[in-house]
Amino acid sequence: MPITSFEFIKGYAQSKVAKGETNDCVVRALAVVEDCDYDTAHRLAATRMRRANRKGVHTLTIVKYFDCEREKYELVKTESNPYKTPMFVHHFIVEGKALKTTYKLKGKEIKCDMTLGTFAKRYNRGRYFVVVRGHALAVVDGQIIGNNDDPTRTRRPVRFAYEAKRATH
């Protein structure tokens, strides 16, 4: 029997808060990337991202949160994002664009949107908070964690992603 994405979220099955929640993809992705339980991530989203119960989080609010947490997270750099700045992310959100990647076809380089599947293959080490249009999820060591259908919906373009920096002790 395959492991569901919810099994990767600490305390999700036992959480009374989770049972009544909807539109909580940001909370679940935070729980996985922060390596904390669901209730802690729920409180974090409520206090730091002003998330109301059963409501989603605006994309710009997510960007502002991660911009304030620079010591813990780093914006993922790709061919289309050489500067790693929040303004770049803001531009892509406003323009509705996705991260780009290149591949070779018959000797020619072709630039295209980076899909969730390509992102998971390319960034197969580490913890990433990933945003696609209207949804947030986590990619941990190349494994897509979010809704139960997220691992099968890999053709969605990635808008932006943040990598959790490794703690140095």
Residue ranges and their predicted role:
Residues 11-13, 17, 108, 165-167:
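Short linear sequence elements within intrinsically disordered, low-complexity coil regions
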Residues 1-72, 76:
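Active-site nucleophile-adjacent alpha helix/oxyanion-hole segment immediately C-terminal to the catalytic cysteine
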Residues 27-33, 41, 130, 137-139, ...:
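Generic hydrophobic secondary-structure signal
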